[in-house]
Amino acid sequence: NTNAAAARVLDRLGISVSPAREAGCCGATEYHLNAQDAGLARARRNIDAWWPAIEAGAEAIVLTASGCGAFVKEYGDLLRSDPAYAEKARRVSALARDLAEVIAAEPLDALADATPRRVAVHCPCTLQHAQRLGGAVDSILTRLGFDLTNVADGHLCCGSAGTYSLTQPELATRLRDNKLDALEAARPDLIVTANVGCQTHLNGAGRTPVRHWIELVDNRLVN
């Protein structure tokens, strides 16, 4: 479980986590499928779910899926004309952080290990393009001693692309196969990514296992 792994790693780094039990889907899928009202309704519900923690002094809203993080960072803009939510949405977007942003800012000695693993990183479009955090996961894993492979055309999409894999399945499959060929070229032990959509789409090919990068870090702590 990605969120559970993230909570354990953050705890090891001395960062307390307050789960927002009422928070749910960020709304991106519906919004991008032309159901904007439904997507924004989800955004409002999430704002309501997070607001008590924000009022209590929460320093960040941490997202483990880069697609969700990119969308939550847009809440302020998307709800700017809603008098009841505009200011709250702006505050939420300002506090939103991808997990890699939080981990990268911490000393990582507590997570270090002498056992290297050969890993290929797929950086999601929503991390490297939408959030402009390309290389963030690579940097963390390198600091932790993982052996990262060189991946050709790392800027290209894996084919998941939010709802694209649903609306254009044939092209999405070709993009996926091309991406996996690039990721597998240097024979990694496994592939990691930072977005559940990419992870699910790539794993659908049944080739090299694809996991969220924080699960790899968490597994090191457990073992």
Q: PLM features: residue spans?
A:
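Iron-sulfur cluster-binding electron-transfer modules in prokaryotic oxidoreductases
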Residues: 1-223
